[in-house]
UniProtKB/Swiss-Prot annotation:
Pfam families: RuBisCO_large, RuBisCO_large_N. The gene is rbcL. The modification N-acetylproline is found at P3. This is Ribulose bisphosphate carboxylase large chain. The lineage of its organism: Eukaryota, Viridiplantae, Streptophyta, Embryophyta, Tracheophyta. Binds 1 Mg(2+) ion per subunit. The disulfide bond which can form in the large chain dimeric partners within the hexadecamer appears to be associated with oxidative stress and protein turnover. One of its GO terms (cellular component) is chloroplast. It comes from Monarda didyma (Scarlet bee-balm). Transmembrane segments: none annotated. One of its GO terms (molecular function) is ribulose-bisphosphate carboxylase activity. Belongs to the RuBisCO large chain family. Type I subfamily. One of its GO terms (biological process) is reductive pentose-phosphate cycle.
């Protein structure tokens, strides 16, 4: 058959290029409750209309490709295509637009964050028609949420397991993060836990290196947990990092942790990957282990203001994939985080239902339909003087994690832990009495110093420490 011969499949098919906006820009479209909705910050190349840029994003992240193909006639594009349904300029920014896209639920595999991201952000970010592209937010429909297990246990179950109520939980990342032997590492864990912390933590890059193999670390940390529990009468935990080079190795480490009887594990969910994270979350629920999540590599994805993906999207993805804690920024420490925006995604982690609120960066109303909540972890350059602000900003359902702010105490790890425990209990007591932590925070800490020499020493060491740098971008 010659190339010019007409076949039934080619009837009505016209080869060649067609503008994306003719098919994928549909401003009259009314979104469905079952659609996944996305808000993209789009910066088109010069000469590319915003309608064409928005349509290109919707097309390339769903059914479209660069040319017309005859196999379009073998399916229903109206049923399966993504749609750019609304475009608005970004106030104060030149040639930037928020383009809203809707995706039919049938495009996505049930219970798979991996597939969701592969579709929505997997290919389109390298598109030549765009100078920059950032995914600002997603609306996950109830029908899709219900296909996920979510966090292994959630906030209330964790508090019940730990028998700890009415205050933020306290943690500490063991430093130096690399180079300690397993025995010395376990000793540092023990000192922090016996001093009054609830948790200690492996740093994100502690896996199984020559200086400290994972099995040795797990054993010495378990010993530290049991010894500190016996001395204090409180339930303690250490985030044992199970992240590994393969899923099989990760699960092997999780099984060993369960056999030791420790309460929790840890995973680096972005470097480890969503498939591995979801597998570990399922294992943790089935075996009664809490799961702490570190967001190592997040700033590679979310730091730029006009390209990449906002952390609120990564936070939503984590709640679907599964984790009981996740690092969320501090607002007050050494790592970047604006207060209103940070509290916006903190609510997305903890609450069942969150209303649209653009002032906090929330583009869509999100209903989690009883999916368990995730505890935000404030960590990075914080110390006892930050305690009133952290307690006021994050509330009780949070983990306040002081690494250098514990281990840097001039008297040692245990006194550093005592200082943090005294500070948080003083702040909670003052708050419960009706005092204003924002206005009276420093006075509250100074009052507590009178009956805690450990806190007084910590306050003296860190009284001048600030992490303030002018924004350059």
């Amino acid at each position: 058959m010659s190339p010019q011969t007409e076949t039934k499949a080619s009837v009505g098919f016209k080869a060649g290029l067609k503008e994306y906006k003719l098919t994928y820009y549909t401003p009259q479209y009314e979104t469905k409750d079952t659609d996944i909705l996305a808000a993209f910050r789009v910066t088109p190349q010069p000469g590319v209309p915003p309608e064409e840029a928005g349509a290109a994003v919707a097309a390339e992240s769903s059914t479209g490709t660069w040319t017309t193909v005859w196999t379009d006639g073998l399916t229903s594009l109206d049923r399966y295509k993504g749609r750019c349904y609304h475009i608005e300029p970004v106030p104060g920014e030149k040639d930037q637009y928020i383009c809203y896209a809707a995706y039919p639920l049938d495009l996505f595999e049930e219970g798979s964050v991996t597939n969701m991201f592969t579709s929505i952000v997997g290919n389109v970010f390298g598109f030549k028609a765009l100078r920059a592209l950032r995914l600002e937010d997603l609306r996950i429909p109830v029908a899709y949420v219900k296909t996920f297990q979510g966090p292994p246990h959630g906030i209330q179950v964790e508090r019940d397991k730990l028998n700890k109520y009415g205050r933020p939980l306290l943690g500490c990342t063991i430093k130096p993060k690399l180079g300690l032997s397993a025995k010395n590492y376990g000793r540092a864990v023990y000192e922090c836990l016996r001093g009054g912390l609830d948790f200690t933590k492996d740093d994100e890059n502690v896996n199984s290196q020559p200086f400290m193999r994972w099995r040795d670390r797990f054993l010495f940390c378990a010993e530290a947990i049991y010894k500190s529990q016996a001395e204090t009468g409180e339930i303690k935990g250490h985030y044992l990092n199970a992240t590994a080079g393969t899923c099989e190795e990760m699960i092997k480490r999780a099984i060993f942790a369960r056999e030791l009887g420790v309460p929790m594990l840890m995973h680096d969910y972005l470097t480890g990957g969503f498939t591995a994270n979801t597998s570990l979350a399922h294992y943790c629920r089935d075996n009664g282990l809490l799961l702490h999540i570190h967001r190592a590599m997040h700033a590679v994805i979310d730091r730029q203001k006009n390209h990449g993906m906002h952390f609120r999207v990564l936070a939503k993805a984590l709640r679907l994939s599964g984790g009981d804690h996740i690092h969320s920024g501090t607002v007050v420490g050494k790592l970047e985080g604006e207060r209103d925006i940070t509290l916006g995604f903190v609510d997305l982690l903890r609450d069942d239902f969150i209303e649209k609120d653009r002032s906090r960066g929330i583009y869509f109303t999100q209903d989690w339909v009883s999916l368990p909540g995730v505890i935000p972890v404030a960590s990075g350059g914080i110390h006892v003087w930050h305690m009133p602000a952290l307690t006021e900003i994050f509330g009780d359902d949070s983990v306040l994690q002081f690494g250098g702010g514990t281990l840097g105490h001039p008297w040692g790890n245990a006194p550093g832990a005592v200082a943090n425990r005294v500070a948080v209990e003083a702040c909670v007591k003052a708050r419960n009495e009706g005092r204003d932590l924002a206005a009276e925070g420093n006075a509250i800490i100074r009052e507590a110093c009178k009956w805690s020499p450990e806190l007084a020493a910590a306050c003296e060491v860190w009284k001048e420490i600030k992490f303030e740098f002018p924004a350059m971008d």
